[in-house]
Amino acid sequence: NEVKEEIEISNKIFLKELGEIPTLFAFPYGETTTEIIELIKEYKFKVAFGQHSGIINETSNMYYLPRFSLNEKYGELDRVKFATSAQGLGVYDFIPANPTIDQNPPFIGFSLLDNKKVQGLDCFIFDSKGQVKREIFKFNERVEIRLNRELSTGRSRMNCTVKDSTGVWRWFGHQFYL
């Protein structure tokens, strides 16, 4: 398949130019599928990065990690300070499992390691049309999110945050692709 060919060509170039094949992988524009993630594992990459913001922690998917962009659009000092002082939210059992969604709007759900964080949690979803209105349902450690409209074609991002009892911001980010 095309992705496999691209990886093999890239690996040959890395080997020729650098003398080794990197163990880190970054998905162009963060767009991937569960099938491509499995392919990345077969090629023995240790971790892979999407293109969504967030904080890495013990529950993070090691093959769809957030990466924090610093550039002219997203490089303000306050944003950098926030990102470097925040901690992961402890999300597990996230659905939809596939970053490339096949149901629109997607049913979004996840659980938190610490159910005390559920009550103050807020989530924001953005696509090319702007912020998507949503309803958030909270059940013990489980969070379910229902969108009031379909996501637009292309990349959409979700960020969930909560301030914990010590005043530290907890953050989880995810990118969807349609």
What is each of the regions a protein language model found here?
Residues 1-18, 81-84:
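Alpha-helical scaffold elements lining the catalytic groove of polysaccharide deacetylases
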Residues 70-178:
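Terminal accessory/targeting
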Residues 13-23, 31-76, 86:
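His/Asp/Glu-enriched short active-site or ligand-binding loop at hydrolase and phosphoryl-transfer sites
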Residues 7-9, 13, 21, 36-40, ...:
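Weak global preference for isoleucine
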Residues 4, 30-31:
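Soluble non-cytosolic domains of exported or imported proteins
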